[in-house]
């Protein structure tokens, strides 16, 4: 069975056909509409899937935000603008006339990365550190989504009660400090206004402030991982995302994790599927799992 997989992100929409063998073909991308209106998103999705839908038997969506009953929600509803409660599943079923499932993109990526692990692993956690910080939890060989779709939103756990206000509305979340957006927001002086990519580049040039910002992010992530180990007793943690996979970052996280008591240590692995993880994970879930 061929699945039409769709990945809905803050800046881009992606779609591809994925066979039962997990091979990705005919991958396409469009920019996410700047206008946060249901009409604009529906039109963009229609343009994205129309060349592909005739070759698929089902649709699987991986999307930013919380997916509940097939609709799009967010920790902070204001972040979605007019897309709050957008009916993802219903819309794609109408556009394609195919059975459709939808899941959070980090949860989908977690499932893809879990399927790619070697050895007898039943419990793992995936963390993506990019513009934000998200995640997914696999326990006993099953992906946890939760009755309300919130499971795995680990970027919104507490890192610093006196830290910056997060986009979700809480104060001091991991995401507000460790994410690419959090790194950039803390930059001052010469680095003010620089994004995380530029700050990483300055690390390689020996910039002291840039090094401090990246170390701060890695230290917060290591503490999060120790908390995750204590909560889930997972066998490994897979780290992805543009920040998580940046040169030298995972090694820094490992250094800070090693400073935690031994009971909270866990194997850290770099994500394998990178930007295709959401597409692949959603397709794998549609092909073999009931959400």
From Swiss-Prot:
- NCBIfam families named among the record's database cross-references: NactlManKinNanK, PRK05082.1
Pathway the protein takes part in = Amino-sugar metabolism; N-acetylneuraminate degradation; D-fructose 6-phosphate from N-acetylneuraminate: step 2/5
Any idea which UniProt keywords this protein has?
Answer: ATP-binding, Carbohydrate metabolism, Kinase, Metal-binding, Nucleotide-binding, Transferase, Zinc
Q: What is this protein called?
A: N-acetylmannosamine kinase
Please list the reactions this protein catalyses.
an N-acyl-D-mannosamine + ATP = an N-acyl-D-mannosamine 6-phosphate + ADP + H(+)
Pfam families assigned: ROK (PF00480)
The entry sums up its family as follows: Belongs to the ROK (NagC/XylR) family. NanK subfamily.
One molecular function GO term is: ATP binding
Q: Which GO terms describe its biological process?
A: N-acetylneuraminate catabolic process
| EC code | 2.7.1.60
Output the InterPro entries linked to this UniProt entry: ATPase_NBD, ManNAc_kinase_bac, ROK, ROK_cs
Q: Could you say which residues bind ATP here?
A: 5-12, 132-139
Binding-site residues, Zn(2+): 156, 166, 168, 173
The reply on keyword RNA-binding is no
Q: How does it assemble?
A: Homodimer.
Task: Please verify whether the record's keywords include Transferase.
Answer: yes
- Tell me the organism: Escherichia fergusonii (strain ATCC 35469 / DSM 13698 / CCUG 18766 / IAM 14443 / JCM 21226 / LMG 7866 / NBRC 102419 / NCTC 12128 / CDC 0568-73)
Stated role? Catalyzes the phosphorylation of N-acetylmannosamine (ManNAc) to ManNAc-6-P.
Q: What class of enzyme is it?
A: transferase
């Amino acid at each position: 069975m061929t699945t039409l997989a769709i990945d809905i992100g803050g800046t881009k929409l992606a779609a591809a056909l994925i066979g039962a063998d997990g091979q990705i073909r005919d991958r396409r991308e469009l920019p996410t509409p700047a206008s946060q209106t249901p009409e604009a998103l529906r039109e963009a999705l229609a343009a994205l899937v129309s060349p592909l839908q005739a070759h698929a038997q089902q649709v699987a969506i991986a999307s930013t935000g919380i997916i509940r009953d097939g609709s799009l929600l967010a920790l902070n509803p204001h972040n979605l603008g007019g897309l709050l409660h957008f009916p993802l599943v219903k819309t794609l079923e109408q556009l394609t006339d195919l059975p459709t499932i939808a899941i959070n993109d980090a949860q989908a990526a977690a499932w893809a990365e879990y399927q790619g692990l070697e050895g007898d692993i039943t419990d793992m956690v995936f963390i993506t550190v990019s513009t934000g910080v998200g995640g997914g939890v696999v326990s006993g060989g099953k992906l946890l989504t939760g009755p309300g779709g919130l499971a795995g939103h680990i970027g919104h756990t507490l890192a610093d009660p006196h830290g910056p206000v997060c986009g979700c509305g809480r104060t001091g979340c991991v995401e507000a400090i460790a994410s690419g957006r959090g790194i950039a927001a803390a930059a001052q002086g010469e680095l003010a206004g620089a994004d995380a990519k530029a700050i990483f580049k300055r690390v390689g040039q020996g910039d002291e402030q840039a090094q401090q910002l990246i170390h701060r992010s890695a230290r917060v992530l290591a503490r999060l991982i120790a908390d995750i180990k204590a909560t889930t007793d997972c066998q490994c943690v897979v780290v992805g995302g543009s920040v998580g996979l940046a040169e030298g970052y995972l090694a820094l996280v490992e250094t800070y994790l090693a400073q935690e008591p031994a009971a909270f240590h866990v194997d850290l692995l770099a994500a394998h599927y990178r930007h295709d993880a959401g597409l692949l994970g959603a397709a794998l879930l549609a092909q073999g799992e009931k959400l």
